[in-house]
Each structure stands twice: as structure tokens, then as C-alpha cells.
């Protein structure tokens, strides 16, 4: 027996399953039982309506039953809640994100400008170096 099967059987034995969807019933019984329970509840409700008592009182405390939902109509002067107008300022989280991106873009621009300046200086030095060498050689030859 594999570990998974052992754990599954242990869990099944320790947990009690109740109701129409429990593992104690077969698949065919499950659907039939649910339909029969529904029909039995309808019969109990009709009998209770005739006798004046509720079906929940007959079943006793602790048993499960259907819940009754009460609907309330809206008053005639119903005014829907107004949503607040969107403010001109961006939301706090969005502002934090913009601030973070702004810092990163600023760093990139600063570093990029430094590298451009260094590159231009190197280009200028390389461009002017042959002339400096030529002038020094010419002055040395004279």
C-alpha cells in the first residue's frame, strides 16, 4: 500500500461523512436520496401548514432544515449611494509607484550623461592626440 493510499484511508476512517453527499452511499443512491428528502420535506411542510406548527418544531432541535429567507421591499424614496468623484490626485499606491520609477529614470539619465561626457572627452583626446604628437615632433625636428 502506498503512502497516499494509507493516508487517505486513515483520513476517511477518522472523518465521519454525513448527508446525501457522504461516502457511505453509492452514486445512484445519492441522487435518489436527495430527491426523496426534498419530497419528504415538502410533505412535512404541507402537514405543518394544515396543523399550524412548523416543520422545524416537529423534527426537533439539532436537526438540519431549510432556511427561510425574508425579502424586504425598498422604500419609495430610495436614493442610491453616490460614489465619490474621482480626485484629481492619483491614488497613494500609484503615486508611490511613479516616485519609484522617477527615481530609477533619474539615475539612468545621470549615469548616461556621465558616460556620454566621458566618451566625448575620450573622443576629443583621441582626435587631438595626433596633432599634439605632430606639433611636438615638428618642434623637435627644428
Curated annotation (Swiss-Prot):
* Transmembrane region(s): 116-138
Residue ranges for the region (Disordered) are 1-32, 46-66
Q: Is the Transferase keyword given for this protein? A: no
* Top-rank taxon: Eukaryota
Q: Name one Pfam family in it.
A: RDD1
The entry's localization annotation reads: Membrane
Primary localisation category: membrane
Per the record, membrane topology reads: Single-pass membrane protein
GO CC terms of this entry? 9+0 non-motile cilium; membrane
Read off the InterPro entries from this record.
RDD1
For this UniProt record, the keywords arranged alphabetically read as follows: Membrane, Transmembrane, Transmembrane helix
The intrachain disulfides are: none
Coiled-coil annotation: which residues?
Answer: none
Looking at the keywords, is Cell membrane present?
Answer: no
Its biological purpose is as follows: Regulates drug efflux through modulation of ABCB1 localization and activity.
User: Mind telling me what this protein is named?
Assistant: Required for drug-induced death protein 1
Native organism is: Homo sapiens (Human)
Gene (name only): C1orf115
